[in-house]
């Protein structure tokens, strides 16, 4: 292919309809037909990136290989496509305006009055085409965050209108995702909200090429025809997206509806071969027909909102399918867990994961959880802060350093077993200043970590400011807490494990970010296998 083709996905009626899942499913089908496909997300908030956003506000912050702190939808893109994303795959209004203002300060606009049109829209269009111009992709799918009609989304909608016009016929299309609600009182599905949403889009100068309708019930042929007529699309371009039991069903549902065929036809591209979803369907088969079942305790401080730990929950699904095991995740709030309630809240679990996080709230509950898992020989996995809590717990309860802590929680502790990284000590800004992205780690032979990975050198993604204090390495190792993985350049301890425990491992990095449908993360796979073994013992 000479020219990259563009697909824009907008949403109407309400937020949280699943634009990211539809975009990822379409990308999966196009990829399975042999097209090099990527997805990017444009978010209309003024934060430069989601790195400083409260997880309750926006869910998990997803970190890419190149160290970008991005929207959790990029996690879906990677899990579906098994292809890494980068900073270029996620753009916010904050980043757009920051770039334009910096250009103005440098005098790049030659004294012109800087306006939303053309300066902001030009910046948006430039970034929309960045991945396409790299030559690496045949098709770029762009998801526009928010809902059509929102004030925040207007510059993006205008940019899409201009870009579709500039690209020319068959080079750019718009998919509009909308809701067809069921009205119980009338006992029928209603198309009016969709009609109004499409009308709002048309008022902005954009005609939807394909309509994807989220619905609880099947759309009748009459209803599809009505939507096609009033929304000005072809009948075959009215696509039903019925509620599914798992998001991993959606590519098959879209294949049945012919979404990929309609998109290719409108882009004037050949269908090539039938999508090869063999491995995908093998995963689904295992996921839906488990032979085992385990209960895993997810101990964290943001458990009220499931999206806060989205990648961890998805990694459990991937690892569960590999082990032909149904993984029941029990969310446990670390703030409400202590010595007195630990047994009541944690007994009966087949494995315990202590989640990442920041700040002092709920820390003592996490430390108590580690003690419980260690003493009761329950399979344990600690991620980032969870690994740090394991070091603190061992220092307190095995070495007898009763006030051992992280300087993040207590700057005056006499045993700072977790300390602020040296390069972080001069940093004052919060945004984008942590140790981020993929870093090397060397695993020692004859360790659990080496056995899990089956290799000595790995690359994992990080997001932290604090680290294992190497001054305590020797004394902790002598006491049985092994540092089985270190950064080969800095000596930073990345992995810790217990020798005399069936499965006890803590990692400073975030393995959940790299787990995908076709490549489940070995740490999660081994953790679930250990949980199955523990249950059957």
UniProtKB/Swiss-Prot annotation:
Mg(2+) binds at residues 73, 143. It catalyses: UTP + L-glutamine + ATP + H2O = CTP + L-glutamate + ADP + phosphate + 2 H(+); L-glutamine + H2O = L-glutamate + NH4(+); UTP + NH4(+) + ATP = CTP + ADP + phosphate + 2 H(+). Coiled coil: none annotated. ATP binds at residues 16-21, 73. It comes from the Bacteria. Keywords: ATP-binding, Glutamine amidotransferase, Ligase, Magnesium, Metal-binding, Nucleotide-binding, Pyrimidine biosynthesis. Pfam families: CTP_synth_N, GATase. Residues 1-269 are annotated as: Amidoligase domain. UTP binds at residues 15, 190-195, 226. Residues 295-537 form the Glutamine amidotransferase type-1 domain. One of its GO terms (biological process) is 'de novo' CTP biosynthetic process. One of its GO terms (cellular component) is cytosol. Its EC number is 6.3.4.2. Allosterically activated by GTP, when glutamine is the substrate; GTP has no effect on the reaction when ammonia is the substrate. The allosteric effector GTP functions by stabilizing the protein conformation that binds the tetrahedral intermediate(s) formed during glutamine hydrolysis. Inhibited by the product CTP, via allosteric rather than competitive inhibition. The active site is at 384 (nucleophile), 510, 512. CTP binds at residues 15, 150-152, 190-195, 226. PANTHER family: CTP SYNTHASE, CTP SYNTHASE-RELATED. CTPSs have evolved a hybrid strategy for distinguishing between UTP and CTP. The overlapping regions of the product feedback inhibitory and substrate sites recognize a common feature in both compounds, the triphosphate moiety. To differentiate isosteric substrate and product pyrimidine rings, an additional pocket far from the expected kinase/ligase catalytic site, specifically recognizes the cytosine and ribose portions of the product inhibitor. Belongs to the CTP synthase family. Catalyzes the ATP-dependent amination of UTP to CTP with either L-glutamine or ammonia as the source of nitrogen. Regulates intracellular CTP levels through interactions with the four ribonucleotide triphosphates. This is CTP synthase. It comes from Flavobacterium psychrophilum (strain ATCC 49511 / DSM 21280 / CIP 103535 / JIP02/86).
């Amino acid at each position: 292919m000479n020219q990259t083709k563009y697909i824009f996905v907008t949403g109407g009626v309400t937020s949280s309809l699943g634009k990211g899942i539809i975009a990822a499913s379409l990308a999966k089908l196009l990829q399975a037909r042999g097209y090099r496909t990527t997805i990017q997300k444009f978010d209309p908030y003024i934060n430069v990136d989601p790195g400083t956003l409260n997880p309750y506000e926006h869910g998990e912050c997803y970190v890419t290989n190149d160290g970008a702190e991005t929207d959790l939808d990029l996690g879906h893109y990677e899990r579906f496509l098994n292809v890494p994303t980068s900073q270029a795959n996620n753009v916010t209004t904050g980043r757009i305006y920051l770039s334009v203002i910096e250009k103005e300060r440098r005098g790049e606009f030659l004294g012109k009055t800087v306006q939303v049109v053309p300066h902001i829209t030009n910046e948006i269009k430039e970034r929309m085409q960045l991945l396409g111009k790299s030559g690496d992709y045949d098709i770029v799918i762009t998801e526009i965050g928010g809902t059509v009609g929102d004030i925040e989304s207007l510059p993006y909608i205008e940019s899409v209108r201009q870009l579709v016009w500039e690209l020319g016929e068959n080079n750019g299309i718009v998919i509009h995702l909308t809701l067809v609600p069921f009205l119980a009182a009338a006992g029928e599905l209603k198309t009016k909200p969709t009609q109004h949403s499409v009308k709002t889009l048309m008022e902005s100068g954009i005609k939807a090429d394909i309509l994807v309708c989220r619905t609880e019930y099947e759309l009748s042929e009459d209803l599809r025809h009505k939507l096609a007529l009033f929304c000005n699309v072809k009948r075959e371009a009215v696509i039903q997206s019925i509620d599914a039991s798992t998001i991993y069903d959606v590519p098959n549902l879209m294949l049945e509806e012919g979404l990929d065929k309609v998109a290719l036809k409108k882009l004037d591209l050949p269908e090539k071969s039938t999508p090869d979803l063999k491995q995908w369907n093998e995963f689904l088969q295992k996921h839906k027909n488990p032979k085992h079942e385990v209960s895993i305790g997810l101990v964290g401080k943001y458990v009220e909102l499931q999206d806060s730990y989205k990648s961890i929950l998805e990694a459990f699904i991937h690892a569960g399918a590999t082990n032909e095991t149904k993984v029941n995740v029990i969310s446990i709030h670390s703030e409400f867990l202590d010595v007195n309630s630990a047994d009541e809240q944690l007994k009966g679990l087949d494995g315990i994961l202590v989640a990442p996080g920041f700040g002092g709230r709920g820390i003592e509950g996490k430390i108590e959880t580690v003690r419980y898992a260690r003493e009761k020989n329950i399979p344990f996995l600690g991620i980032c802060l969870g690994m740090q809590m394991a070091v603190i717990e061992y220092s307190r309860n095995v070495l007898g350093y009763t006030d051992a802590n992280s300087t993040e929680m207590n700057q005056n502790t006499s045993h700072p077993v977790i300390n602020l990284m040296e390069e972080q000590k001069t940093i004052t800004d919060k945004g984008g200043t942590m140790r981020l992205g993929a870093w090397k780690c060397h695993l020692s032979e004859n360790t659990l970590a080496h056995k899990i990975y089956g290799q000595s050198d790995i690359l994992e993604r990080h997001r932290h400011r604090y680290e294992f204090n190497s001054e305590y390495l020797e004394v902790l190792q002598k006491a049985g807490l092994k540092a089985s993985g270190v950064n080969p350049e800095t000596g930073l301890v990345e992995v810790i494990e217990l020798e005399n425990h069936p499965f006890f491992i803590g990692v400073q990095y975030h393995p959940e970010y790299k787990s995908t449908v076709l490549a489940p993360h070995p740490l999660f796979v081994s953790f679930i296998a250990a949980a199955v073994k523990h249950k059957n013992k």
